[in-house]
């Protein structure tokens, strides 16, 4: 999420 490369189910930045 949020500018990192983690897979999180949010409407943040690049997953």
From Swiss-Prot:
Protein location: Secreted
GO cellular component terms listed in the entry, alphabetical order: extracellular region
Chief localization: secreted
Keywords carried by this UniProt record: Glycoprotein, Secreted
Post-translational modification: Glycosylated.
Coiled coil: none
Signal peptide: none
Keyword match Secreted: yes
Function: Rathke gland secretions may function as pheromones, as predator repellents, or contribute to the maintenance of the turtle shell.
Name of the featured protein: Rathke gland glycoprotein
Species per Swiss-Prot/TrEMBL record: Caretta caretta
């Amino acid at each position: 999420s949020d500018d990192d490369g983690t897979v999180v189910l949010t409407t943040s930045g690049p997953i």
